[in-house]
Each structure stands twice: as C-alpha cells, then as structure tokens.
Amino acid sequence: MALNFDQPMNIICMKWGSKFSPEYVNRLYAMVSRNMDSKFRFVCFTENSEGIRPEVEIQDLPELELPAGSPERGWRKLTVFKENFGGLSGPTLFLDLDVVIVGKLDAFFSQPGDFLIAHDKKSPKKREGNSSVFRFEAGKYPQILDYFEKNSE
C-alpha cells in the first residue's frame, strides 16, 4: 500500500471509564505529532472529552452489544470494525492510550496488507495479536464485530 500524501492518515484511540485521564490522550497526540511526517487525522472515541486538547477530534464512544452482565474486558476495541465507524475510510492506525512512541509512525501506513497486528511474543506458538497497536482498513471488516456480538456468551 503506497502512502497517499493528499489524504491524512487516520490515527485513533479510545478512552472510556476512569482508568486513563485525559492527559494520556494529550500525551499520545503529542507523541504522534512528533513522529508523523505525513498529515494525519487524530480521533479519540470517548464518552468524556473534558481536558482533551483541542487538536484532537472527539467522537462518541460506540456501544458494544454484549449480553447483560458480561464484563467489558477491552472488547470495546472491536467496535472499530463497525460499518461507517466514525466516518473513517482507508488505512487506520489504532493506538492504546498507554503506548510509548519512540520512532516514526509513517511506516505503519506503507506496509502491505489490509490488517496488520503485532504478534504476541508472550505466546509465540499461538496465532494471536497484541491489539495495543494495529492497522486496518476502516469499514472493511464489519463481519468481525457482527460475529463477536452474536457469539459473545
């Protein structure tokens, strides 16, 4: 996939509940802005935007359809696969709020493939990914969320 410098690169995060303060979003934005040479669109999906710097685009946190009483456990990330998620299209990089960025991010957008996720080094024999950082084509995989919501018991 070649970089399209006319189109800003989508970089997103999610903040819900009280585990992370707005400062985590602000720091993440600052790290991204220092480590992107390309134009980017930074979007935070949250239910509380108080304290988040104005450069960050705020969108409502999507709901996840889980059976009543089910623990959330971070599954909310799967809502990025909703059809028309946040009005985003094209390559999108998801970053957890507690990642530390130490180098340029532009290469995440030039690697081939529609879905990229880090192999989980803790379980080298399993085919699992670490979802702290992953790149996907926005709007391309709604069946992932549909399947999870129908089979999450």
What is the meaning of each model-derived region?
Residues 1-153:
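Glycosyltransferase catalytic domains, chiefly GT-A lineage
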